[in-house]
Amino acid sequence: MVVSPGDLHGEVTAPGSKSFTQRAVLISAFSSTPLVLGNVAFCDDDMVSIEIAKKCGLNVSTSKNSLRVQGEFRHPDSIFAGESGTSYRLVVGLLAGKRSIVDIELSRQLAGRPIRPLLAALSERGLTYRMDDLTLHLDGSGITSGKIRIDGSESSQFVSASVLFQSMIGGEGIVMISNRIVSGGYVNLTANILSRFGPAVRETENGFRVTGEFNHAPLSLSADGDYSATGFLFSAGLLCSPDGIVVHGLQPNSDQPDSAVLQMIPCSSDAAKEDSYAVSKRQLEQITVDAASNPDLAPPLAVLGMFSEAGCRIMNPGRLRGKESDRYADIKRLARAFGSRIQDSGDLLFIRKGDSGRYPELLAFTEHRMIMAGIIAGIASGKPVKHSNVEKIAKSYPSFLSDLKRLGAGVEFL
């Protein structure tokens, strides 16, 4: 596929947050609570959670941008977690809380991502498990209620999974946290969605207390706009849109940690529509992003640094190694491809504009966010660039290419 540059302008709506959708669908399924959910992106990760719900006996019907979950939970014999780290980790906590005996089938990529700290924490409550290549065998039949102890520094998803485990066990459940939670806003997102279904999550001095029962009353929700995906639209506007881009559907008080992008870049809110933000091409000041807190913002903001004299500072870049790809290495590879200057101290990665005449003919990243970053960089370079593996963008933002085309980029499939 070739993406050609252009002066982008216009309005788009942010895709629905996959973090919101996966949590809502899985909680609905495991609690047997009817759900209507709007603003669904139906990205690949969303579809994993939908298929898990179906394997658990729920009926899931879909329309253009919404879905309906109905039915009663049944213990599945097996489920497929695809490449979705969120669904994988959350469902481990949910299945353990339901005392299920189940096989979780994994992709090769997902099988290599961290899970053992969560399994070790749940094993203290009676979970037994075995990993055979691409299958995780879980036996929750011996699960007992009690405290869960989890390290928050590895992944916020481990903490969210522990909270969901306690909600399924019922009664009062305690989750004790050691070390600071990375991307802790996602735990708040889990807690707030869970509370809509009945259970309350209260933060304590050293963790969380989960109380209350599921009320099982039919629920109607709408997924927030996805700030992680919107980071690419903001970068495109700041680099390539003299007339400006407006993005709709972004909740200003979202629990998504990546809503912090609003404080990292120059953007303006729409007084008439509080969920809309505008960006336009301008000279940029230096941008800083902490990869420990906002790893998904590092790729789009790195692109801003690549075409800015002030540059972009990425703190704790080592946290980018544990994502779907080694984003630490990939971001540097992308920057070099466009002639950008790089300073890497290990604790801090600094990228800024370099040889403006350099650009690649072909980019071949394999991870969805790096592919999107490469596409925005190509447009900003002013040159047509070929991109492979673009089908992987559907993991998080299926309408990305059509949105860019609507804004004025040239998109041609070869």
Protein language model annotation of sequence segments:
Residues M1-L414:
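Short, structured segments at the rim of ligand-binding sites
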